[in-house]
């Protein structure tokens, strides 16, 4: 299936692309800049609105739901395979899909370790692999890391089934905390699917948008 064909399966009209050198602005770069702005008080101009991050995640989940609906699994969702472009930071998903995964994991094991689901490392392949990865990406979007070591430690703890959520997240945003915990649980049969996640995130986006308008 060609990437363009997936556009018609996705109500939010987000295309799915295979990663290429033409896609220069990776989400991983964006997050590094955002974290610098948060902790170093630099002059880097990146959006800091909570609703913005939820909106971008809704875009991502919408794209994943589209590929899952045609029995395609990404198997390697991570910030280096998510691209942002334009003044509105339009989001695109790249990377290796489906049966290509076995070759990719062999050649790039360190790149996917923190984002790959525990069962995925054991060669259990299911759409729920992507849901774990989405949980990690969501956490990174909404919780800036001060250092690379802090990031690695936190995501490794998730991999080791230690779900210690920051108080600022669990107390300030309990619904988001609940969603992240559901996505990164180790029993993949209990993880929600992309359709459920999209509905939950769209509802959250509506709530945050409504609250912002009242302020």
UniProtKB/Swiss-Prot annotation:
Q: Which reaction does it catalyse?
A: L-seryl-[protein] + ATP = O-phospho-L-seryl-[protein] + ADP + H(+); L-threonyl-[protein] + ATP = O-phospho-L-threonyl-[protein] + ADP + H(+)
Pfam families per record? Pkinase (PF00069)
- Record SMART domains: S_TKc (SM00220)
Enumerate the InterPro entries for this protein.
CC_SR_Kinase (IPR050339), Kinase-like_dom_sf (IPR011009), Prot_kinase_dom (IPR000719)
Keyword Transferase assigned? yes
Its chief place of residence is host cell
GO BP, one annotated term: regulation of translation
* Subcellular location as annotated: Host cytoplasm
> What keywords does the record list, in alphabetical order?
ATP-binding, Host cytoplasm, Host-virus interaction, Kinase, Nucleotide-binding, Serine/threonine-protein kinase, Transferase
Q: What class of enzyme is it?
A: transferase
The GO terms describing molecular function are:
ATP binding; protein serine kinase activity; protein serine/threonine kinase activity
GO CC terms, sorted: host cell cytoplasm
Give start and end of each Protein kinase domain.
Answer: 1-205
Taken from the UniProt record, the cysteine pairs bridged by disulfide bonds within this chain are none
EC code(s) of this entry: 2.7.11.1
Give the multimer and partner information.
Interacts with the kinase domain of host EIF2AK2.
Its function? Plays a role in the inhibition of host eIF2alpha/EIF2S1 phosphorylation, thereby increasing viral fitness. In the insect host, targets the endogenous insect heme-regulated inhibitor (HRI)-like eIF2alpha kinase.
The family this protein is said to belong to: Belongs to the protein kinase superfamily. Ser/Thr protein kinase family.
Q: What is this protein called?
A: Probable serine/threonine-protein kinase 2
The scientific name of the source species is Autographa californica nuclear polyhedrosis virus (AcMNPV)
